[in-house]
Structures are given as structure tokens and as C-alpha cells.
């Protein structure tokens, strides 16, 4: 009753000459993926315990996990600005769950206050048979309190270009360093 859902989708063209497999491999590099988060101040691997549900892709997302690629989890600390100009910053600790899919990665982020973001990051072909090139697609479903949905959605909408740019820059760098 007090929970709301929002969908957000961001698409960035992948420059010509970058193979799809290279872009997919980048998305499946979980630690690099985390490092693209502009708010991240710390992260560490978090093994699954017997009481944790095994991360999986929810039904209805039209993607399947890669067989033989076990899910990976991390605990990530983000520094979030609660007031402008850094007058009041807050560290938010979230659990990131990564499930590799054929053309990218599914990421579930579980944050405090019941905020859950489920994202499919894929490399897709543009046009008929990919004739128009490739694109990086970020498709997010946000679920949280109605009171927070606008703030969470705004945060997703405000920083996506920088994240995508960092990924594209990494793909274009011939020696593979960020």
C-alpha cells in the first residue's frame, strides 16, 4: 500500500569498432562496475551464507542467468549528500547482488529503508541485425516507500551519464586501464 515502483531506462551508443563481447565482459567485471559508482567510498566481497537467499533474476525481466556463473555479492558504502554543499553527508551501506546474463549483468541493490533497485545492464544491437551498431542499456526497476521514490529516481537520473561515460571510456582505452 505504501510501496511504490518506478522504471528508469538509460541508453548510450557504444562507439563503432568496439566488439559486443568486450562490452559484455566489461559489464560482467563486477568490481569495475562498482568502481563506476560516483558515490562509492568502500566496497568488499560478501560471501553468501546459508540464511541468505541465492541471488536470482526475477521472472518478467526477459533475461536468463549464465549457466555455471555463480552470483556474486558485495557490501558497498556510498556517501550520499543529505543537504547541499556537503553540509550533511551520510554513509549508506547496501548489498549488491550480481548475476551474469548472456549480454551483460543483472544487479540488485538492497539499501536501508527498504529501497531495492533491480537493474539489467545489457549490450544490445541497434537496428536490423545490429546494422546501426551497439548500445549500452541500463533498465532499472526501483521499489521503495512512496516517500522515497522521487529521491531515489532523481539520484538514478542525475548520475547515469557519468557512469556510462566511464564505461565507454574504459572500452575505448586500448590497454584496458580505466
Model-found features: residue ranges?
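Hydrophobic ligand-binding cavity/cleft-lining segments
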Residues: 1-73
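Detector for long, hydrophilic, low-complexity intrinsically disordered regions
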Residues: 3, 147, 176-178
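Hydrophobic residues positioned within well-ordered beta-strands of beta-sheet architectures
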Residues: 8-10, 76, 94, 119, ...
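Short beta-strand segments that buttress and anchor functional surface loops
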Residues: 75-85, 106-112
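Short, surface-exposed beta-strand/loop "edge" segments at domain boundaries and coil↔beta transitions
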Residues: 80-92, 115-119
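Beta-strand/loop substructures that line and gate deep hydrophobic ligand-binding cavities in soluble
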Residues: 97-158
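Short, highly charged C-terminal tails/helix-capping segments
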Residues: 166-178
Amino acid at each position: 500500500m505504501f510501496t511504490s515502483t518506478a522504471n528508469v531506462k538509460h541508453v548510450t551508443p557504444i562507439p563503432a569498432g568496439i566488439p559486443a563481447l568486450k562490452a559484455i565482459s566489461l559489464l560482467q567485471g563486477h568490481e569495475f562496475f562498482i568502481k563506476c559508482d560516483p558515490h562509492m567510498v568502500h566496497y568488499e566481497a560478501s560471501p553468501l551464507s546459508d540464511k541468505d537467499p541465492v541471488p536470482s533474476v526475477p521472472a518478467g525481466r526477459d533475461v536468463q542467468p549464465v549457466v555455471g556463473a555463480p552470483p556474486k555479492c558485495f557490501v558497498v558504502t556510498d556517501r550520499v549528500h543529505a543537504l547541499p554543499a556537503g553540509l550533511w553527508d551520510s554513509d549508506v551501506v547496501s548489498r549488491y547482488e550480481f548475476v551474469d546474463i548472456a549480454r551483460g549483468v543483472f544487479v540488485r541493490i538492497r539499501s536501508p529503508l527498504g529501497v531495492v533497485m533491480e537493474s539489467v545492464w545489457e549490450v544490445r544491437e541497434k537496428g536490423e541485425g545490429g546494422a546501426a551498431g551497439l548500445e549500452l542499456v541500463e533498465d532499472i526497476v526501483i521499489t521503495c516507500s512512496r516517500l522515497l521514490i522521487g529521491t531515489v529516481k532523481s539520484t538514478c537520473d542525475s548520475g547515469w551519464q557519468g557512469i556510462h561515460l566511464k564505461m565507454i571510456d574504459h572500452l575505448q582505452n586500448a590497454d584496458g586501464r580505466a
